[in-house]
Every structure is written in structure tokens, then in C-alpha cells.
Amino acid sequence: MTFSVDKVRADFPVLSREVNGLPLAYLDSAASAQKPSQVIDAEAEFYRHGYAAVHRGIHTLSAQATEKMENVRKRASLFINARSAEELVFVRGTTEGINLVANSWGNSNVRAGDNIIISQMEHHANIVPWQMLCARVGAELRVIPLNPDGTLQLETLPTLFDEKTRLLAITHVSNVLGTENPLAEMITLAHQHGAKVLVDGAQAVMHHPVDVQALDCDFYVFSGHKLYGPTGIGILYVKEALLQEMPPWEGGGSMIATVSLSEGTTWTKAPWRFEAGTPNTGGIIGLGAALEYVSALGLNNIAEYEQNLMHYALSQLAAVPDLTLYGPPDRLGVIAFNLGKHHAYDVGSFLDNYGIAVRTGHHCAMPLMAYYNVPAMCRASLAMYNTHEEVDRLVTGLQRIHRLLG
């Protein structure tokens, strides 16, 4: 299938709107991607004609809704090449998935004197849950430091592991720098030391294929809303043997086998024992539509188009005076920058006046900001629906801001 950005853009209604009298150039998909009509329509159709509470219902609507939900679990397992659909837990998003692991697996396996390894480029969602776990049990949090070019100091990694290392929690792709970490060698090293590996895939799954079996990671987590799906839904993959050993972290309906006031409660099997309460069934249906949409386009086709667009953007941005770019030349999805000494919020506000949407702030990565000694950065993110013309508008906008502000 030949990739056509014009055909893709036609599927996204919001891309036809104007902002401040100018065509919208949406360069903020790393925060949250826009939704194609196929996703919007699938979720709307479910609520119009197919909605019912899932699980245990004997009536037709409930049975059909349950089947649709479980079919999405199967589709998601194929999307990341899991061995079984029962290795996938529906979660609200990447943040909840990481917290689930920290509170279930972590509480059961991390003890006083143990340690967990993260990196300096992590999103707060892959820092704070581990800080909280370490504080609860008396464990140590160790950090892989950054290089100035936005890559990790991988030569330090072997020195961080020891017999007390229980987990390496690492991002697949940095949400600020676009750095893609060499997971294969990092996971191999972790397993050689008897540690498990959790991968934050929030910024990876929309850019190229992910194969969790080939990676051999123990946990992999991502969100639907960055993958052109709805908010409030995500996927946590856990190797089956691990998942079956993990206790539930939330109690309620749907995750029990039996409940007795005198004899206590027993749990249903995984993954359902991690899905307490009424699920976000509409969001799950929308996620399924997003996975189907992206798969039909072909992730390899998307990757090729986006990489060409990224190379073009980096080459054009080199012509902007006083522009500081952060991150390595080979990157995925995002371009973080500052313009002279101007605050990122000011630059972002000017760009918004030109109809260009970028993200400004610390991007939930304060330790990374501290490393670069800046309070904030602007971040333009490139998705499969962005164009060379939108990159040109960004470059022109930054040149105009430089002339205005000096």
C-alpha cells in the first residue's frame, strides 16, 4: 500500500479547521494525537446501537459488547506480537499501567536494600511510581545519566546493576528528545543480572512496529490517545508467567472469583483480575478502531514517511537563527527547541497566533530540564498526518519571532 498523506489527512476532521484565521498546523501529537473519523464513528456507533455492560450478561447486547471488547484485546496482542491476548491488561493509559506494575509486582518483589534502575530522560510517569515504591519499602532508585546529545551514558549501565537490582524501567522513545533507546542490549544486560524490564512505549508504538517477543521485555505499556485512539484507555503487556503471579492492586467487581464475608475473597484469573469495575468499553472499541486504522496504513509505511519528514524538518530548522535543538540527529517523533533566551511559553504563544500548535513547558520531564539547565522547552511533534508545508510554516514562524523579539 502506498502511503498518501493527503488521504490520511482527509480522515481527520479537525485538520480542516482554522486557528486565529489560519489553517491549523497541529504539531502536538506527542502530547495527544488527533482522531480519525474511523475511530470517532466506531465509538459513536457502539454507544448508539451496541452499548451494554460487559461480562456475565446473558442478553444479546451484553454478550456482543463483551465479544467486541475481547476482540480488541486480541487485536492489540497482534499489534505488539504478544504470545497471547491474555497477556494484555486494559488500563486507563501508560501512567496507570506503570502504577499497576509498581503496586502489584513491585510490592511483592521489591524489598529493603533492593534497587530499581531508571534513566534521566524518563517521563514523570516512569519516575514517580518507582520513587513511591522505593520510599515504601526502603529500596534505592538508580539513574542512568544523559549525554549532552540526548543519548544515555550506556557505558555506566553495567556499573548500576548488582545482585539487588530488581527492575530496569526505561522509555522506548524519549517524549522530549526523540531518542530511541537500544532496548535489545539493555534488556539482555538486565536479564543477565536477574532483573525484570519494564518499557514505557507511549512514544514508540505509533511510529514503527513493536514486537514484545523479540524485545523479550517483561512489561510493555502504552496509551491509546497517542495512537490516534480515545483518551482513557491503554494497554499493559505482561509476560504470562509474571502476570499469573501478580496480585490485584484494585478491588471491586469483575476481578473476583468468589466473595464471602466469612471466608474472604478469591480472585479471577489474569488479566481480568486487574480490571476491577466497569471498563471503559467505548474507549476500548475506539482503541480497536485506531489499531485497525494504523495497521491498514502499515506501520512500516508510516515510519518511512515520518522519518523523511523528520530529516526535512531538522535540515530546515538549521536555518533559524539562535535556535537550540535538543536531542540526537536520529530521533523519532519530536523536536525540542528553544529560541534564543526567550521563554518557551512566549515562543509557543506567538506560534499559536500563526495557527501552529506546539507544546511548551517541562513536558513532565523535570530531571531532563534540570540537566539542560532550562525551565522549559518548546516541542514540535511530527505525526503521519503532518506535511512538509507545515514544517515550512513552523520555520517561517520561528524566523518571524526571531525578527520581532531579537
Swiss-Prot record:
Protein keywords: Cytoplasm, Lyase, Pyridoxal phosphate, Transferase
Its UniProt pathway annotation is: Cofactor biosynthesis; iron-sulfur cluster biosynthesis
Q: What cellular-component terms does GO give this entry? A: cytoplasm
Concerning InterPro entries, the annotation shows: Aminotrans_V_dom (IPR000192), Aminotrans_V_PyrdxlP_BS (IPR020578), Cys_dSase_SufS (IPR010970), PyrdxlP-dep_Trfase (IPR015424), PyrdxlP-dep_Trfase_major (IPR015421), PyrdxlP-dep_Trfase_small (IPR015422)
Enzyme Commission numbers on file:
2.8.1.7, 4.4.1.16
GO annotation (BP), single: cysteine metabolic process
What PROSITE patterns does UniProt report for this protein, alphabetically?
Answer: AA_TRANSFER_CLASS_5
Q: Where in the cell is it found?
A: Cytoplasm
Q: Does the keyword Transferase apply?
A: yes
Write down the required cofactor(s): pyridoxal 5'-phosphate
- An example of a Pfam family matching this protein is Aminotran_5
Catalytic reaction equation(s)? (sulfur carrier)-H + L-cysteine = (sulfur carrier)-SH + L-alanine; L-selenocysteine + AH2 = hydrogenselenide + L-alanine + A + H(+)
- On this chain, the residues bearing N6-(pyridoxal phosphate)lysine are K226
One function term, GO molecular function aspect: selenocysteine lyase activity
Name the residues annotated as catalytic in the UniProt entry: C364
Looking at the keywords, is Lyase present? yes
Q: Which domain of life is it from?
A: Bacteria
Major site of localization recorded for this protein = cytoplasm
Segments passing through the bilayer:
none
Summarize the subunit comment.
Answer: Homodimer. Interacts with SufE and the SufBCD complex composed of SufB, SufC and SufD. The interaction with SufE is required to mediate the direct transfer of the sulfur atom from the S-sulfanylcysteine.
Task: Give the similarity note.
Answer: Belongs to the class-V pyridoxal-phosphate-dependent aminotransferase family. Csd subfamily.
The protein's job, in short, is: Cysteine desulfurases mobilize the sulfur from L-cysteine to yield L-alanine, an essential step in sulfur metabolism for biosynthesis of a variety of sulfur-containing biomolecules. Component of the suf operon, which is activated and required under specific conditions such as oxidative stress and iron limitation. Acts as a potent selenocysteine lyase in vitro, that mobilizes selenium from L-selenocysteine. Selenocysteine lyase activity is however unsure in vivo.
Q: What is this protein called?
A: Cysteine desulfurase
Q: Which organism is it from?
A: Escherichia coli O127:H6 (strain E2348/69 / EPEC)
Give the gene that encodes this protein. Answer: sufS
